[in-house]
Swiss-Prot record:
BP term (GO), one: response to antibiotic
GO molecular function: RNA binding; rRNA (adenine-N6,N6-)-dimethyltransferase activity
Gene: ermA
GO CC annotation, single: cytosol
UniProt feature, compositional bias: Low complexity: 1-25
Gly residues: bias regions: 301-314
Protein name: rRNA adenine N-6-methyltransferase
Role: Involved in erythromycin resistance.
Protein species of origin: Aeromicrobium erythreum (strain ATCC 51598 / DSM 8599 / JCM 8359 / NBRC 15406 / NRRL B-3381)
Coiled-coil annotated spans: none
Lineage: Bacteria, Bacillati, Actinomycetota, Actinomycetes, Propionibacteriales
Keyword Cell cycle in record: no
Amino acid sequence: MAGPQDRPRGRGPSSGRPQRPVGGRSQRDRDRRVLGQNFLRDPATIRRIADAADVDPDGLVVEAGPGEGLLTRELARRAGRVRTYELDQRLARRLSTDLAQETSIEVVHADFLTAPHPEEPFQFVGAIPYGITSAIVDWCLTAPTLTSATLVTQQEFARKRTGDYGRWTALTVTTWPTFEWQYVAKVDRTLFTPVPRVHSAIMRLRRRPQPLLRDAAARSRFADMVEIGFVGKGGSLYRSLTREWPRSKVDSAFARADVHHDEIVAFVHPDQWITLFQLLDGSRGGAARGPGDQRGRRGRPGGGPRPDGRAGGGPRRDAGGRRTGDGRGGRPRPPRGGQA
């Protein structure tokens, strides 16, 4: 089970003739450094990760960075099938040999970020390099058939994304109607070999059986509201929203959602965001516009749908509310930090 060092964007050592040790480092040491390989060998933590994943005994599990395969074997004992992606050619070859008798395990020597999303429902599990955490999270969030993702990430990342500090990120709020984010447990850095500089944590994403906002168009409008709130120049969420919605409507919505007027946007709970949206959706007009001006933000009367049926004029979004294009018919954007 590999992870958590940063993986550089450059290429690793060539696969040609054996390289002579440099500075006392063996080829294996250099591979670990290039590929971000820190191995988790603590059996109790391995079981804790598998417990948190709560895998379907008849389902597919996709794993990234199996390393020495300890978590892979534990998952195979609990799941129907495991498909694991290993970028390190040496480890992939060894895993294929060691697991040859395990018919439920498929070892794929490839960069996980280039892997297609499975067409069938699946769960993701992995201890991943810090440097590509955001790219892997994006891969998971954009997978239509993903049911859950259990990741070992840098502890700081896990705490920020799950609201463990009492603050919430725009990514978490935007995807909240579709995904639940959970901080599971700290993983002490001393449990890895070699020992990284910071602690890790188990974080879990779970797709909700029914989205909190069931209409895809509503989720897209919700994502637009979240964007306005987080990038607005008003200083507070209240000031940002009153630039786009009537002040009286915002006052009423804040009172019913129990949000103070001076609340900083990061401290507003995602559930409060949902309430605000449900109370404000459909009343968008903006305090700065005159009483006779009902034009929407993009210059169409009432901010109504485009002739092509798309609501509003903002960027295209997937079912989870995440951007998938530039709103002008452009091609979908690749995940941040990922490979196109």
